[in-house]
Amino acid sequence: MKVVIMAGGKGTRMLSIASDIPKPMIPIEGRPVLEREIECLCEQGFTDILITVGHLGNVIMDYFGNGLKFGAHITYYFEKKPLGNAGALFQVKDQLTDDFLLLNADAMFDIDFNRFVQYHKTHDAVATLFTHPNSHPYDSGVIIADEHMAVRKWLAKEDERPEYFKNRVNAGLHVLNKKILEQTVEGGKIDLDRQLLKPLAGTGQM
């Protein structure tokens, strides 16, 4: 299964402490966050990795190269202009497997990816998300699921919230089916949550 790691953002909130390296390359105990992410994937057999890069992408490409010394096969898509956090997917869709993992590049995790993928396949979903509580749900997109864990509603941070919802947000770990990229999306920059995932809420496909 192909893994796509999104590493093209500018990481503006981190500029004050790391202006010369992209956020996924910030070291934690001496090793970049992205290296730890790739290590976790490879340990579970997910070695076919495509990284989308943009701002300071050369730092990532120089560090990981073709991925062989990390036990992976890594290729890259370089965004010459910002495409939003999902725009690059439409540029590389011919390289994707029918189902693929899509991960944020700046997340540290310890999860069973094979179980995650199997859950997605068992439910014949277009999109499967890993969710978690966070410390600032008031400015995050909140996900409301039914008793069967199907996403019933997706509230972007700018949406009104006239009632109380539990604190459940997208962790940036997804299994997607390539058919999600068959839709026509308006605009030059494409937002994953608002334009691709949110429309699936309430359809039984996520």
What are these regions, as identified by a protein language model?
Residues 27, 144, 175-177:
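Short, well-ordered beta-strand micro-motif
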Residues 36, 40, 59, 91, ...:
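Alpha-helical elements of Rossmann-like donor-binding domains used by nucleotide-donor carbohydrate transfer enzymes
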Residues 61-62, 66-147, 183:
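Conserved beta-loop-beta/alpha segment of the NTase-like Rossmann-fold superfamily
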Residues 46, 100-101, 108, 114-121, ...:
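Catalytic-core segments of class I nucleotidyltransferases/pyrophosphorylases
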Residues 2, 47-49, 73, 126, ...:
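Residues at the starts of beta-strands that form the adenosine-phosphate
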Residues 1-61:
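N-terminal glycine-rich phosphate-binding loop and ensuing alpha1 helix
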Residues 25, 143-145, 197:
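A structural signal for short hydrophobic beta-strand segments in well-ordered beta-sheet cores
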